[in-house]
Amino acid sequence: TDAELKLYADELAHKFIITDGHVDLPYRLRMKNFRLEREYLGIPVSTKEGDFDYERAKKGGLDAPFMSIYIPSSYQLQPDFGKSLADSLISMITGIADAHPDKFAIALSPAEVEANFKTGKISLPMGMENGAPIGNDLANLKYFFDKGIRYITLTHGKDNQICDSSYDTTATSNGLSAFGEQVVAEMNNLGIMVDISHVSDSTFYDVLKITKAPLIASHSSCRKFTPGFQRNMSDDMIKKLGENGGVIQINFGSAFLDSAVRAGNEENRKKLQALLDEQGLKATDSLAAPIIEQFQKENPSLFADVKIVADHIDHVVTLAGIDHVGFGSDFDGVGDSLPTGLKDVSQFPNLIYELLKRGYSEADIKKVCGANVLRVWNEVQAFAQSK
């Protein structure tokens, strides 16, 4: 029965390790001026805000959310390219783990994720979103590896010194820069996963030529469902990622999942903007608040739903096979745009239930939940150790 299948999904969510390629907790806490003091330290354990905390992660069976050390593109213009911001976000995550040693632990390898899972702790592996803080010095890769960074998203919303971004239109390097080629090779040598979410198509193909280890897309979805949205991966890219042994971790943001939802929300945004312009108001003006509230009541946001996330997973399986897909929610990073049924980390069982309904086996579910990502991480580590 349906009720039994739901219980079974919940059981599997807790039986298997669930990884999530991208959770933006660090930056969300930074925006709140989070400090490592007693009254703040409870936030990562239990909070009504945001999409992630310990209690909800336990409920949903999430075991290893990659904490995003996010460096906004504006930091590329700073003298240190955002290195001090990266340091402070890393310290925040290590501080949270130190403050709650019974609940959280930093994880530097798949073996540590597995050990933490056995003792009921949530692993906090770290990935850096935007390679800007490497600056122009390859030695910074070792510096960040030693601080615990295990993947680097080569760029974010703008082209940087390493490569071009899918959100930018300038094609500064027409893909990977000469320095970027060295960065990829050195990441392979150190055992840092190369993350191709956010990069332009030509960057992706350039990286494929150079990498000697499997790649990840930490939080990207399938372009088939969002034609023209360069931030998602095309069918050809997904196939090639599979041939490389890599894994695409599906982003749960509605705009990444469904072009109709994306277009509807964009339409609403334009309507609201026109309404405010008419009154000569900015969205941040106090007089705008009631207008915005009324507009949102009459034109509620559209959301994708959990079935569409499963459609994206199905599509990757069709193109590349069951070994090349995982979860990369972007929780705490996509704002109020999460699908119905996947509003926070407590709801992973809803997605597992949807996959079970489609005939995914227990072995399949285990792979999608986390085994695929841990395999890639192990392979990346093994390549580095063979040097």
What is each residue range found by the language model?
Residues 220:
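Catalytic glutamate of the conserved HExxH
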Residues 182-196, 200-206, 235-243, 315:
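Substrate-binding cleft of carbohydrate-active enzyme catalytic domains
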Residues 122, 192, 213:
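A short helix->loop->beta-strand "cap" motif at the edges of active sites that frequently abuts
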Residues 172-188, 207-217, 351:
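Alpha-helix-loop-beta-strand connector modules within alpha/beta enzyme cores
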Residues 137-141, 203-213:
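Distinct, well-ordered alpha-helical segments
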Residues 1-174, 223, 227-387:
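N-terminal hydrophobic targeting/anchoring segments and the immediately downstream early-domain regions
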